[in-house]
Amino acid sequence: MAELKLGYKASAEQFAPRELVELAVAAEEHGMDSATVSDHFQPWRHEGGHAPFSLAWMTAVGERTTRLQLGTSVLTPTFRYNPAVIAQAFATMGCLYPDRIFLGVGTGEALNEIATGYEGEWPEFKERYARLRESVRLMRELWLGDRVDFEGEYYKTKGASIYDVPEGGIPIYIAAGGPQVAKYAGRAGDGFICTSGKGEELYKEKLIPAMREGAEAAGKNPDDVDRMIEIKISYDTDPELALENTRFWAPLSLTAEQKHSIDDPMEMEKAADELPIEQVAKRWIVASDPDEAVAKVADYVDYGLNHLVFHAPGHDQRRFLELFQRDLEPRLRKLG
């Protein structure tokens, strides 16, 4: 059975850079094993939104902590970034903070890429997925330390070398919302990432089996793939506050179809704020009783997920960390 890990999601769309660093430091002090950060050029909402640069945040947190695993959840290495440069950045961080850095990747969203110069209609999944696979292949080659001449459909290098690379390169975690990418994550990734609140069938019958199939096809032990899930949890001893705290994150309750081509935070905010609080809260575990909260989290462990990263929606994150350490962590550790 894979090791149970508890992580903290640093909400880059909600907090300014310095505060976000301090929250990750506090997460380590409160017993978390990892801290992940999203990589947004623009936040989900305009009013009260933030978008600090993920890689600067990771290095700042790396200097202030000693044991937290640090990674993106997730970064898109395929449009506004050149994957060769991302490979260099993560190799450098891997040298600075050995055995603590991982790169979580996904296929991208219009919100972050069109504002930075992508022209034309936002690509459908087929192209975005092809770009992701090619970028992962290029980064893996560069981390071997050799000179790389790469001639892909989307990316090219000529005699490219990364001179400072930790032994073994950097673990890559691949975000998967369906079985096709989950299978790829098992085959090509060191870990895979999914998010909570989407129904038991998705995890038990699609994502986990597909991930295991991909790993086995690649000759890997599926249990060696770190299975991360971002668990959206609004836990507070005050039930009204637990519900109300979810409101800031209403954009997460928009469907993929509703937000596919939205590239403006103001437009995203407008669409999200039209949703009733009941619909917003459906994506979250909303609880004021610790046993109830842990019972709902335990379902994901039963599905086969071992790295639980907790995303709390409220503005008072220190309160959440204190309540988490007092009420939830002791119960959660018993699940492992």
Swiss-Prot record:
Encoding gene per record: fgd
Protein name: F420-dependent glucose-6-phosphate dehydrogenase
Parts forming coiled coils: none
Quaternary structure, from the entry: Homodimer.
Primary enzyme class: oxidoreductase
Gene Ontology BP term (one): carbohydrate metabolic process
Source superkingdom: Bacteria
Keywords: Carbohydrate metabolism, Oxidoreductase
Enzyme Commission numbers on file: 1.1.98.2
Catalytic activity: oxidized coenzyme F420-(gamma-L-Glu)(n) + D-glucose 6-phosphate + H(+) = 6-phospho-D-glucono-1,5-lactone + reduced coenzyme F420-(gamma-L-Glu)(n)
Binding site for substrate: T195, K198, K259, R283
GO function term, MF aspect, one: coenzyme F420 binding
Binding site for coenzyme F420-(gamma-Glu)n: D39, T76, T107, G108, N112, G177, G178, Q180, V181
One Pfam family it belongs to: Bac_luciferase
CDD domains: Tetrahydromethanopterin_reductase (cd01097)
Function: Catalyzes the coenzyme F420-dependent oxidation of glucose 6-phosphate (G6P) to 6-phosphogluconolactone. Appears to have a role in resistance to oxidative stress, via its consumption of G6P that serves as a source of reducing power to combat oxidative stress in mycobacteria.
Active-site residues from the entry: H40 (proton donor), E109 (proton acceptor)
Organism from which the protein derives: Mycolicibacterium gilvum (strain PYR-GCK) (Mycobacterium gilvum (strain PYR-GCK))
Family: Belongs to the F420-dependent glucose-6-phosphate dehydrogenase family.
